[in-house]
A protein has these predicted regions:
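N-terminal secretory signal peptides that target proteins for export/translocation
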Residues: 1-6
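Bacterial N-terminal signal peptides
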Residues: 8-20
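The feature marks the first
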Residues: 31-79
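Sequence context surrounding c-type heme c attachment/ligation sites in exported
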Residues: 37-45, 64-67, 71, 130-142, ...
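Axial heme c-ligation environment in periplasmic c-type cytochrome domains
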Residues: 55-61, 76-118, 153-158, 176-208
Length: 208
């Protein structure tokens, strides 16, 4: 092998070695659900229950929610991009690693189904969720949240099984400007009336 070739091979091997070393911290920083559970049991349990299940209807169900989405919301509570005095106080004490650990804990729980309660709203809720309202430029909710309400990690939350009261409160908050950390949702909610919001909220909680 010529000297120049040996030098080139050596540089390639050195580069590959550097890549491996650079990847090690990322692996070490992987979220730890056990640490998340420890934080949850001391900080989150009062409002969200031990496993993030069906607690008070005013508070969201966290079990089975996408980890990336939960981290985004915690980060935005901490930064003041999403307003809630209680959650800002809780999130402010969390590091980025803490948030990832807590999110991994809740995301690892099995999401449980909910049940729609108002049959009178079923048709209207399904119509908007699956087809939107073209005359008012309202897109189908299923386009972002999925046909079964499973959502898209980081961007759009799981809605299936969520408290109807919580969903209704968030849609109203988007509509009136109390919540503004999602431009798409602000635009959609602004076009929904009270009956449509109630119908959607009740419908999506029963999605499977």
């Amino acid at each position: 092998m010529k000297p120049a070739a040996r030098v080139s091979v050596g540089l390639v091997l050195a580069f590959l070695g550097a890549c491996v070393l650079a990847a090690e911290p990322a692996a070490a920083a992987r979220a730890d659900p056990a640490k998340g559970e420890a934080i949850s049991s001391g900080t989150c349990v009062a409002c969200h229950t031990n496993d993030g299940s069906r607690g008070v209807a005013a508070n969201p169900i966290l079990q089975g929610q996408h980890a990336d989405y939960l981290v985004k919301q915690l980060s935005e509570f901490k930064a003041g991009k999403r307003e809630n005095a209680i959650m800002k106080g809780m999130a402010s004490a969390l590091s980025e690693a803490d948030m990832k650990n807590v999110a991994a804990f809740y995301a690892g729980k099995q999401a449980k189904p909910g049940f729609a309660k108002n049959k009178d709203f079923a048709t209207l809720g399904e119509k908007i969720y699956r087809g939107g309202a073209a005359d008012r430029a309202i897109p189908a909710c299923a386009g972002c949240h999925g046909p079964n309400g499973a959502g898209i990690p980081a961007q759009y939350p799981r809605l299936a099984g969520q408290h109807a009261d919580y969903i209704e409160a968030q849609l109203v908050a988007f509509r009136v400007g109390l919540r503004h950390n999602s431009e798409p949702m602000t635009g959609v909610a602004a076009k929904l009336n009270d009956r449509e919001i109630k119908a959607l909220s009740d419908y999506v909680t029963g999605l499977r």
